[in-house]
């Protein structure tokens, strides 16, 4: 199960999947029976369900040749919403005159926000369109070895979106929604409000699935899953007050409020999503008896995950490394329990080979290059180079 978090969250998930692939001796992350994706996780889940490995995804993200398909860039992810902007330019002059006339009759009782909300209906429904990512995913899944049809997959894939008008959770790939192309479903699931315009499918206006529910464990359980791995990149930052900023009188500790309104909004959104998730976590055991659930997420003191905005493409290697390290941290915290849980489901895991691979490459002088090799090379190649095969 893969949650949201924009480009940053998606790359974090690729790193986590890479570590899980290396950890499991007799399975790969492409052999799960059920994949559930929400927001950015829907993009990654769509590729994984189609057999694309984490290292192949990372090679594409890093634009490393050879790649299994065309690389992705910010021009694909951030395609301006030209249609809505054109409409706004056409109607805004008349809209402005009408709003000003209406407000003029009530001078003294109006403020700036009255003007903003008065003009809002003439503004675009989002700065960007998901048309670029939909087209890209459609091309990738159009390969003869892959499919853009939920019904043609060997495993099960479910992507969630939210109906903007009714507030319902829409499970794309299930019931009446299984005939929607996977690429269209993923574009709807990733339509973060105000950033991206809503996506219309079957007459419904759909937005980011993470708005309604963060991870959707119930979907996997209802599909018959008894072992569920949840990767959640959305964790609010817990300030340790170690960083300082200069002031006229010297310096003081840095606070989230110093980072501007985008980070304040992002922190608030992650806090709500994380609180909702962990409220659900507390009831997982009694709600889903007989189901083993493992949760993987960043450390709350992880400054890189917090400072990197959700559409930042430049820090992808570092973010993927953090995803990888979240899995190794999970190993360090409770390896015996993890090993026992995996064994119950016929999965053999080895912390030793993960440690040996990381140790082998961390000895190199250039850390970024070493981590790129860990993230981009096949498991077999890594094991051979670390003397384990």
Feature-to-residue mapping (PLM):
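Patatin-like phospholipase
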Residues: 1-38, 43-389
């Amino acid at each position: 199960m893969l949650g949201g978090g924009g480009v940053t969250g998606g790359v974090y998930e690729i790193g986590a999947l890479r570590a899980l692939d290396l950890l499991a001796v007799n399975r790969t992350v492409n052999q799960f029976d059920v994949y559930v994706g929400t927001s950015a996780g829907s993009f990654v889940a769509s590729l994984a369900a189609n057999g694309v490995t984490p290292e192949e995804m990372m090679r594409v993200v890093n634009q490393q040749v050879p790649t299994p398909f065309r690389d992705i860039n910010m021009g694909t992810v951030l395609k301006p919403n030209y249609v809505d902007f054109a409409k706004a330019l056409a109607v805004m002059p008349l809209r402005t005159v009408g709003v000003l006339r209406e407000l003029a009759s009530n001078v003294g009782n109006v403020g700036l926000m009255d003007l903003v909300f008065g003009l809002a209906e003439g503004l675009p429904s989002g700065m960007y369109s998901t048309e670029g990512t939909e087209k890209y995913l459609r091309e990738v899944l159009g390969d003869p070895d892959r499919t853009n049809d939920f019904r043609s997959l060997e495993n099960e894939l479910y992507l969630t979106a939210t109906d903007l008008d009714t507030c319902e959770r829409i499970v794309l790939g299930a019931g009446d929604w299984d005939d929607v192309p996977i690429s269209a479903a993923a574009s709807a699931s990733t339509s973060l409000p105000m950033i991206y315009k809503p996506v219309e499918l079957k007459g419904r206006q759909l937005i980011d699935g993470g708005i309604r529910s963060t991870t959707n464990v119930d979907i996997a359980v209802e599909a018959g899953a008894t072992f569920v791995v949840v990767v959640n990149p959305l964790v609010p930052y817990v300030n340790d007050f170690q960083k300082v900023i200069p002031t006229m009188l010297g310096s003081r500790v840095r606070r989230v409020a110093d980072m501007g309104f985008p980070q304040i909004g992002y922190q608030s959104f992650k806090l709500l999503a994380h609180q909702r998730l962990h409220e659900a976590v507390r009831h997982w055991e009694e709600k889903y008896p007989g189901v083993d659930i493992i949760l993987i997420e960043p450390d709350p003191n992880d400054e890189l995950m917090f400072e990197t905005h959700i559409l930042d493409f430049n820090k992808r290697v570092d973010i993927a490394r953090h995803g990888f390290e979240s899995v190794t941290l999970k190993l360090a915290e409770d390896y015996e329990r993890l090993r026992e849980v995996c064994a119950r489901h016929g999965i053999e895991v080895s912390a030793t080979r993960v440690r040996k691979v990381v140790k082998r490459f961390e000895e190199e002088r250039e850390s970024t290059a070493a981590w790129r090799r860990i993230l981009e090379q096949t498991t077999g190649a890594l094991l051979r180079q670390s003397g384990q095969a």
